Each structure stands twice: as structure tokens, then as C-alpha cells.
Amino acid sequence: MKCSWREGNKIQLLENGEQYYPAVFKAIGEAQERIILETFIWFEDNVGKQLHAALLAAAQRGVKAEVLLDGYGSPDLSDEFVNELTAAGVVFRYYDPRPRLFGMRTNVFRRMHRKIVVIDARIAFIGGLNYSSEHMSSYGPEAKQDYAVRLEGPIVEDILQFELENLPGQSAARRWWRRHHKAEENRQPGEAQVLLVWRDNEEHRDDIERHYLKMLTQAQREVIIANAYFFPGYRFLHALRKAARRGVRIKLIIQGEPDMPIVRVGARLLYNYLVKGGVQVFEYRRRPLHGKVALMDDHWATVGSSNLDPLSLSLNLEANVIIHDRHFNQTLRDNLNGIIAADCQQVDETMLPKRTWWNLTKSVLAFHFLRHFPALVGWLPAHTPRLTQVDPPAQPTMETQDRVETENTGVNP
């Protein structure tokens, strides 16, 4: 499947769970025909229970609902929680589930990391938020800072087609859609141009990274990137410095406190390389950064699930949208500049680690390990990821009057 730019779309930026979850649950509540939901994480907490209730109500009123969860990111949903949905008719699948070894999850690589919702070919959501109370400010200091978009217009048809291509048993649905569906002539609720891009392990291995590189090459005035896990390849780093050196203002927002020590060590090498190359690096300090967004000049932006690290760029299944829209671009710029002013600390040369032989050795080793990590994973025994559907619970046998009389008389019904 290949997608092209679609015009006439309406797009809304959603920040954190306070904006995202009410919008998603409202759309599910208004669904009439079909819901497709993909996510990496679904926890059985307050947010997860609200999603459960919304999907259950939709299925009970006759809406066809399908859910795809990652087997690593969502391993602990209770049988009761899932069975209630499947009993109501929700099709519930896990992406590549694996048994635990000594209580530890073993399926850490090549994950389904996308976060997509499609409602009736009318509305779609795509971004970085999972379904967890961690995305609500009420969660406390560890609440995540994140973004998603709500989409209406022709791009939703592309996102639905993408989902139908990737879910099993959908060949008949795809054929029916192509034969019978005609886009409504005037169904262009907005002015945004939008392109769906994704990363898989087949024909689209580097599509998301390629669009980033093209953006950096074309930038003339300003680029702002906010990304939770920033550890791209040589080409990306070189493109950043090259853009900065030709006068483009580059602002890079990353986590102030990475959750893995090796990432912190490697990042210090990036700080030296980028800051001395003219890139403005900002550490977001208010709370954990989980966003994956960027903008360029006045008209280019992206929002989605893809980090800029080896896992997202080389192993995981990811999805972003690329957006050409001046109003959306300005909205995102205002938001990112706001968190830079209020919640970030700029990295300057006084904060860079001393270039001793020991610090340099540690940074170089960590950097090259992380960059070659996908290749190292490639040496592991290959397997074909599978989708495992959860069967509805068995229904108890009904004690009908005919059955009672048959058992009493010994006569076949």
C-alpha cells in the first residue's frame, strides 16, 4: 500500500490525556458502524476502564469493534477484563505475545508501537498516547507530556485502508470498500494537507526517517523537534548540524532525565556534537517527555508514535502523519516554545562534560552500541510476528424445558 498527500482535512492538536481521552471516548460513543483501535499499552487503571466501558457500550449497540494490543506493552490485562469485551463481540488481538521466562517478558524487540484509532471512516486519531493514567496530570510528577491529533477528512480513508491491509481476515472488507466506497464530493472539512507515513519491516523500513531528512534539507528558518528518545543515526545528526550551519535555527527538546543510564551516557556525546555544531538543545525538566512531534518553518509538522532512536527507526512498527497547514504549525510552535520557556533548561558549553579520555571512551562505546543495536538484534533467531486473537468465553449450556424432559424420559429430541 502507498499513500499520497490528501487535501481538505481538519486537524486538531491534542495535548496529554486531559484533551486526548475525552475526544477519543466521545468519538467511540458516537460510532455507528466500525471502530479500529491499536495501541502499545493499555492498563487496567482508571483510564483503561473508561476505554473498556466505551468499547463495551459500542459493541452492545451493534458497532463492529476491533482492538490490537502489543503483546509486550500490554501483557497484564485480566481475563475478566478482556472476556467481557470479547463476549460482547469485540475482536481482541495481541501482537506477537510470548511466554515469560523467570517472570520476565522476552518479546522486547520488533514491537507494534503504533497508536491509532479509526471511527467509521469519519474520524481518526494518531499520536504517542497509550491508554494509561500516566498520561493524566493527576498522576503526579511522573505524568507524561505527550501529543496526538484528531483528524477528519480524506486522510481518514487512507488510515482505514492501512488498518484493513494490516489486520487479518479483512480481504473481503477491502474488496467491498474498493467496490462500493466513494468519497463524499464535499467532504473536505478543513484545509490541511496530510500524508500518512509508517515504518514496517518490509517495504517501508525507513519512510519516517526519510521524511525527517527531507525536512531538514528543505528547512530555511526554523526547526523544532520534541522527542522522548533521541538517538538517531549518523545521517540524521549530520543533517541537523548542516542545517544549523547554514543558518537554520534548530531547537531540540529531549528528556532531562533519561530512564536508562546508557542513554544518558550516549546523549552526552550528542550534546558535544550538536551544541558545538550550532543546535540549541533543551532538556525538558517538568516531567517525563513522551512526545514525538516536530515542525519546520511555517507549513511542515509531524505527530505520531515514532521516536528518533534505534528501536523506532529500525525495529518497531510505527505510524506518523505529516501535516502541511500554517494554522496547525503555529499552534504546535506556540505550544513547544511555551514549554521551552517554562519547563526547559538549555544545554550550553558550560554544561558539557569535560573531554577527558575516559569520558570520551565511555560516550563513544555507548553511542556505537546503541547505533548498532538493531544490527545486533538481527543476529538473534528470526521469527515471524503473529497476531493472536482472544476467543470469546464459552457460553454455559442453557437448561431448556426440552432438555429437562429429554433427560427424564430418555427420548431423543
UniProtKB/Swiss-Prot annotation:
Domain named PLD phosphodiesterase: residues: 108-135, 285-312
GO molecular function, one term: cardiolipin synthase activity
The keyword Membrane is annotated on this UniProt entry: yes
PROSITE patterns the record matches: PLD (PS50035)
Catalytic activity: 2 a 1,2-diacyl-sn-glycero-3-phospho-(1'-sn-glycerol) = a cardiolipin + glycerol
Keywords assigned by UniProt, alphabetized: Cell membrane, Lipid biosynthesis, Lipid metabolism, Membrane, Phospholipid biosynthesis, Phospholipid metabolism, Repeat, Transferase
Claim: Membrane is one of the keywords in the record: yes
Membrane-topology annotation of the record: Peripheral membrane protein
Residue ranges, annotated region (Disordered): 388-413
GO biological process, one term: cardiolipin biosynthetic process
Broad class of where this protein is predominantly found: membrane
Catalytic residues, chain numbering: H113, K115, D120, H290, K292, D297
InterPro entries: Cardiolipin_synth_ClsB, PLD-like_dom, PLipase_D/transphosphatidylase
Pfam family, one: PLDc_2
Cellular compartment(s): Cell membrane
Broad enzyme group: transferase
Cystine pairs: none
Matches recorded under CDD domains: PLDc_CLS_1, PLDc_ybhO_like_2
Recorded coiled-coil stretches: none
A Gene Ontology term for the protein's cellular component: plasma membrane
Function: Catalyzes the phosphatidyl group transfer from one phosphatidylglycerol molecule to another to form cardiolipin (CL) (diphosphatidylglycerol) and glycerol.
Family per record: Belongs to the phospholipase D family. Cardiolipin synthase subfamily. ClsB sub-subfamily.
Name by which UniProt lists this protein: Cardiolipin synthase B
Organism, scientific name: Shigella flexneri
Gene this protein is translated from: clsB
